[in-house]
Amino acid sequence: MGDRLYIFDTTLRDGEQSPGASMSKEEKIRIARQLERLGVDIIEAGFAAASPGDFDAIHAIAETIKDSTVCSLARANERDVRAAGEAIKPAARGRIHTFIATSPIHMEKKLRMSPDEVVDAAVKAVKIAREYTDDVEFSAEDALRSDIDFLARIFGEVIKAGATTLNVPDTVGYAVPRLTEAFFRELIARTPGGDKVVWSAHCHNDLGMAVANSLAAVLGGARQVECTINGLGERAGNASLEEVVMAVKTRRDVFGVDSRVDATQIVPASKLVSTVTGYPVQPNKAIVGANAFAHESGIHQDGVLKHRETYEIMSAESVGWSANRLTLGKLSGRNAFKTKLSELGIVLDSEEALNAAFARFKELADKKREIFDEDLHALVSDEMVTIEREDYKLVSLKVVSETGEPPLASIVFVEHGQEQHGESSGSGPVDAAFKAIEKVVGSGAELELYSVNAITKGTESQGEVTVRLSREGRIVNGQGADTDIIVASAKAYLSALNKLTIEEKMNAQAAA
């Protein structure tokens, strides 16, 4: 058994900072439960002082999660730290993660504080955090561009104040692996009391090296890695949890560490986060992409058929892909459906959700002869979103399209409990459907992105549509899936409108 590597997931905090990736409290709870099943050690549930909505979500997650540590971020000031402390109070295990910038450019231009003032603020924040919990993490923002002597000083002081985990973020994704490993080795050696705490890496992907730098930090002595599902995060994203976990698992000979993550829950977690945030996973994404275990070359196919390990360093099943791609049919019953969901790592929160998902499955089975695992993931995720959000819900859609004539869309949907009818022409069937919705709603939102992804192969495949809308500075992603791509598009548009409505409700409650 090697050293323990702690996996700190920040999908719900740093990941949510991706444009349009905002989540409701219920969605955050659902993802937190999946992260707990995955076996992550620490779930950073949000930034308690940022908004009442964030505080409520952290508090609810702290009440729900029993096995993982629930953490809140806090700037190094009393208001933030106390908000974090109150938010995590119900947690079986709670952590406060406080931070302040330490690079010369950040201290001078952003904080306008002297190094001594920064040290004092950090020490005070850690001491206040210890009033709430014995588990306190301190981060030196922009650490990889900070003076190492100053870092050793501030880290030494916060250790004396009670910090138990020290995080060294590459905030702007500037680091390179060789220097990262050396930096960690030197910093740990030079920090007074550095052998008494857990050292952590938090790397961003601006130069495409977040995972490589995180692994280099492990070689340099880090025993916690901060990461997100699918590498989600602002700008180019964060270190990808699935890549970090499988790298240390597959190359234990190099890294000599073990995590407690259940790798078979990786794909279910990836699919859930993708659906909730509206961020599709690129097909060639390591571990969780649709092509991650596909072999096109004849030579590769021949080798894999003879012995899988000729071209596969891990099995698809080991990370949660199902070995049996073809699943249920129209004659399958509710128990078979429930059993298959369990095999796929899909857990529904209630009998109501299971019944609704099974009804949707039966509808899909009437349209599609072969139903694959990917269909079930899309169907169940879509149903969970529908149960939660009833402000806008599609009832029916009819589109008439004739060569040389503009398509005409007639739509019926529920708006705030009332059935609405809309009709419009457009430059194409999707445009007509969107305009028919807007004729009724008049949201004033701008369409920023429209993308379509085939969930499985063949002409019967469900199409998964992502729609990104923006309004008054807010950006949201909506998703919809159906065998009819126009219907999927309408679902995605209404899903995005629902997210805008949820954000407005949360803002109104915060202002009240």
Swiss-Prot record:
GO-annotated molecular function: 2-isopropylmalate synthase activity; acetyl-CoA C-acetyltransferase activity; manganese ion binding
Principal subcellular localization: cytoplasm
PROSITE patterns per record: AIPM_HOMOCIT_SYNTH_1 (PS00815), AIPM_HOMOCIT_SYNTH_2 (PS00816), PYR_CT (PS50991)
Any single biological process term in GO: L-leucine biosynthetic process
CC per GO annotation: cytosol
SMART domains xref list: LeuA_dimer (SM00917)
Pfam entry (one): LeuA_dimer
Localization per record: Cytoplasm
Biological or metabolic pathway of the protein: Amino-acid biosynthesis; L-leucine biosynthesis; L-leucine from 3-methyl-2-oxobutanoate: step 1/4
EC category name: transferase
Catalytic activity: 3-methyl-2-oxobutanoate + acetyl-CoA + H2O = (2S)-2-isopropylmalate + CoA + H(+)
Chain spans, region Regulatory domain: 393-512
Residues reported in the UniProt entry to bind Mn(2+): D14, H202, H204, N238
Every Pyruvate carboxyltransferase domain range: 5-267
Keyword Manganese in record: yes
Keywords annotated in UniProt: Amino-acid biosynthesis, Branched-chain amino acid biosynthesis, Cytoplasm, Leucine biosynthesis, Manganese, Metal-binding, Transferase
Entries under InterPro entries matching the protein: 2-IPM_HCS-like (IPR050073), 2-isopropylmalate_synth_dimer (IPR013709), AIPM/Hcit_synth_CS (IPR002034), Aldolase_TIM (IPR013785), LeuA/HCS_post-cat (IPR054691), LeuA_allosteric_dom_sf (IPR036230), LeuA_bact_synth (IPR005671), PYR_CT (IPR000891)
Record EC number: 2.3.3.13
Cofactors, names only: Mn(2+)
PANTHER family: 2-ISOPROPYLMALATE SYNTHASE 1, CHLOROPLASTIC-RELATED (PTHR10277:SF9), HOMOCITRATE SYNTHASE-RELATED (PTHR10277)
Function: Catalyzes the condensation of the acetyl group of acetyl-CoA with 3-methyl-2-oxobutanoate (2-ketoisovalerate) to form 3-carboxy-3-hydroxy-4-methylpentanoate (2-isopropylmalate).
HAMAP family with a match to the protein in the record: LeuA_type1 (MF_01025)
Family under the similarity heading: Belongs to the alpha-IPM synthase/homocitrate synthase family. LeuA type 1 subfamily.
NCBIfam families hit by this protein: leuA_bact, PRK00915.1-3, PRK00915.1-4
Subunit comment: Homodimer.
Protein name stated in the entry: 2-isopropylmalate synthase
UniProt source species: Chromobacterium violaceum (strain ATCC 12472 / DSM 30191 / JCM 1249 / CCUG 213 / NBRC 12614 / NCIMB 9131 / NCTC 9757 / MK)
Gene label: leuA
